[in-house]
Amino acid sequence: LLHLRGRLKVLLTPNYETAEKFVNKYGNNIVGIISDVRFPRNGTKNPTAGVEFAKWVRSIHPSMPVMLQSTDLENHTMAEAIGADFLHKNSNTLLQDLRDFIISNFGFGDFTFRLENGQKIYKATNIKELIKGIEEVQIESILFHGRSNHFSNWLAARSEFNLASRLRSLDVNQYESGEDVR
């Protein structure tokens, strides 16, 4: 998914090479990747093209949310090894799992401040409440969301592209303390 000209867009690519071109062209505007584990690369079906693509994307954009999907449950191990989420296409909860991933990582819905362990600590439904949350929640939550670009993705989903781009370009590790990030 990426945002251009005021709205988020979904780009569907037929092969590895086209996906790579899209990332090179739109990389700073992409809010996340959902990919099959297996898809065409160099003209033939490649059983690990999605994993290779995810690794390549992460080498350029380390905090990019990535979900790999497959009918083969054993591919979960490869996804886990590269820090990607995994979606089993034969799961009874497929649609709910996909929805949860998109809402949690691409900025749709309310902004839920969480700790790294997933514990929910505050919910913001608008920018005013987001600012209040940033002022009040634990530093650990701010660092977690800052490292993962959750703030910029959430703002981009609300057409706040200038602010989202400015936040995305910041690296929380460049600050002396968590309070400086706040």
Can you describe what each PLM-predicted range is?
Residues L2-G32, N42:
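Acidic, metal-coordinating helix/loop segments flanking the phosphotransfer/catalytic sites
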Residues S141-N173:
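Amphipathic alpha-helical packing elements
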Residues L170-R182:
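Charge-dense polyanion-binding interfaces
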Residues D110-F144, E179-R182:
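Membrane-interacting alpha-helical segments
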Residues N29-V31, I60-P65:
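His-Asp phosphorelay/catalytic-motif detector in bacterial-type signaling
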Residues E20-K21, R38-S63:
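Short amphipathic alpha-helix used as the core "switch/output" element in two-component signaling
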Residues I33-V37:
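Active-site T/S-Asp motif of two-component receiver
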Residues G6-N15, G43-N46, M67-T112, E116-Q119:
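Output/docking surface of receiver
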